[in-house]
Amino acid sequence: MSRIGKKPVVIPSGVTINVAAGNKVEVKGAKATLSKTFSTDVTFSVADNVATITLNNNSKNAVAQSGTARAILSNMVEGVSKGFERKLKIIGVGYRAKAQGNELNLTLGFSHPVVYKLPQGITAETPAPTEIILKGADKELLGKVASEIREYRKPEPYKGKGVRYEDEYVAKKEAKKK
């Protein structure tokens, strides 16, 4: 087994894990309910507020799947109990964002505003016109949404204008001189 796959997942109070046929795991908590179907190379067992993962065979793929399954299960448990948050910053003259219900209106220097429809389970806040805070229980979906929003206007290397993650560092280039 992998190092990560050997570690048990501690289940906090208020969170329940159900393992159904076909390795479908459902995690219920205060914030949300998440479900995912895992590889048949691993088996889940839940006892005494601890979930453990065991291998069905010792193939290289099964060993890799054990670590992946444990990490995903841990993220699901944390997501339904605490939730995840991703912050984006918008840098550029006239660049701004505004959250309206399940849509995010972005003005990013195009001739038209960009309207991004948020998927179910993800919420957006704009405490300032140049800040976006995305929240959700599903870490994978949250990262995908943040990546798609960033993709509209990636930070450019000369002035740094664009949409970036809050903790992202953009290496700046010097302009060409004649």
From Swiss-Prot:
PROSITE patterns: RIBOSOMAL_L6_1. Pfam families: Ribosomal_L6. One of its GO terms (cellular component) is cytosolic large ribosomal subunit. InterPro entries: Ribosomal_uL6-like, Ribosomal_uL6-like_a/b-dom_sf, Ribosomal_uL6_a/b-dom, Ribosomal_uL6_bac-type, Ribosomal_uL6_CS. One of its GO terms (molecular function) is structural constituent of ribosome. This is Large ribosomal subunit protein uL6. Keywords: Ribonucleoprotein, Ribosomal protein, RNA-binding, rRNA-binding. One of its GO terms (biological process) is cytoplasmic translation. PANTHER family: 60S/50S RIBOSOMAL PROTEIN L6/L9 (PTHR11655), LARGE RIBOSOMAL SUBUNIT PROTEIN UL6M (PTHR11655:SF14). It comes from the Bacteria. Part of the 50S ribosomal subunit. This protein binds to the 23S rRNA, and is important in its secondary structure. It is located near the subunit interface in the base of the L7/L12 stalk, and near the tRNA binding site of the peptidyltransferase center. The keyword Ribosomal protein applies. Belongs to the universal ribosomal protein uL6 family.
